[in-house]
């Protein structure tokens, strides 16, 4: 029944799917009669975009500019603003701090969550991640139910590290025995980094929309990590990025470039079920409120 509701919810929300506006050249963004005005600073040409059609603005050019009135309007309309560095990797994000009317109460519930509750939540997250990794390998013809032995043995808090053990098998089967998943490693690691960073931004936005604090994690608790809860909740979604990177590699693309950035951004509107991350965040908030025990994550298809 929960799966049926999730499918209906995803279908309904897809009808209202929004887009990411990516600025890659020297343009100025301003507010014009309630619309986003995008002015080419070289030609003076102006393009207008409706605020209602945009859920994220990504600034990927250090010469681009945005006016304060537009920034204020964007965050008031729950549009995230993401800034990229000189390597085109997203490095910072601006979001509305009052995106949910139940925010204060949900913050309190989240902070009051017991250790056993968080351990059970982490078990669910790890199970969902391993399940999607296993499904992806099966769909790619790289092994049926290969990781399910680890899925079936995840304990509270993943005390036996089934996630790490499954990951070793997963990457070897997915990318080949010579591949090493390393943030600073050789291609296609940079594309994985880019996709995961965008995923993290999208999950942070969904958590804020659900009235949760992305800064308070379930498992990730590094004091230098700004969004540990997003890092926790994005785990079951990583295989979506992995599959898109594989598709790009089949097309001969191995590094972050215009083609790979476009494909990885479109992933969040074409491949991942619409509003799936908001559903995951909302059901997590429900667990903290005592209204349920299950966090909903989509199955990769």
Model-derived regions: residue spans:
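A broad, structure-centric signal for solvent-exposed, well-ordered loop/edge residues
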Residues: 38, 45, 56-58, 66, ...
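N- or domain-start disorder-to-order transition segments that initiate the globular core
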Residues: 13-50
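N-terminal amphipathic/basic-hydrophobic helices that include classical n-h-c signal peptides
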Residues: 1-15
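Generic structural signal for well-ordered secondary structure
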Residues: 29, 50, 63-67, 119, ...
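Active-site helix-to-loop segments that bind/position phosphate- or nucleotide-bearing substrates
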Residues: 9, 17-20, 26-27, 35, ...
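A short alpha-helix capping/helix-coil boundary motif
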Residues: 48-51, 181-183
């Amino acid at each position: 029944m929960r799966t049926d509701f999730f499918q209906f919810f995803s279908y309904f929300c897809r009808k209202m799917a929004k887009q990411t506006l990516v600025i890659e050249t020297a343009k100025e963004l301003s507010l014009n009669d309630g619309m986003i005005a995008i002015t080419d600073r070289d030609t003076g040409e102006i393009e207008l975009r409706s605020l209602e059609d945009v859920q994220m603005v990504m600034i990927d050019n250090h010469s681009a500019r945005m006016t304060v009135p537009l920034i204020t309007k964007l965050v008031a309309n729950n549009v995230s603003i993401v800034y990229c560095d000189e390597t085109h990797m997203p490095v910072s994000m601006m979001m509305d701090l009052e995106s949910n009317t139940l925010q204060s109460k949900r913050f309190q519930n989240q902070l009051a969550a017991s250790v056993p509750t968080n351990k059970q939540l982490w078990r669910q997250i790890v199970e969902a991640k391993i399940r999607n990794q296993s499904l992806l390998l099966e769909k790619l013809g790289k092994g049926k139910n290969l990781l399910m032995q680890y899925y079936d043995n995840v304990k509270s808090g993943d005390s036996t590290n089934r996630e790490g053990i499954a990951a070793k098998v997963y990457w070897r089967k997915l990318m080949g025995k010579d591949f090493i998943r390393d943030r600073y490693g050789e291609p296609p690691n940079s594309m994985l980094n880019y996709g995961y960073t965008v995923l993290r931004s999208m999950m942070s936005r969904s958590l804020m929309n659900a009235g949760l604090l992305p800064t308070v994690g379930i498992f990730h608790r590094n004091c230098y990590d700004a969004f540990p809860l997003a890092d926790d909740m994005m785990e079951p979604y990583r295989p979506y990025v992995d599959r898109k990177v594989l598709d790009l590699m089949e097309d001969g693309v191995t590094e972050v470039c215009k083609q790979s950035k476009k494909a990885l951004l479109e992933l969040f509107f074409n491949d991942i079920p619409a509003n799936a991350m908001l559903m995951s965040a909302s059901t997590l908030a429900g667990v903290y409120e005592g209204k349920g025990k299950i966090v909903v994550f989509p199955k990769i298809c």
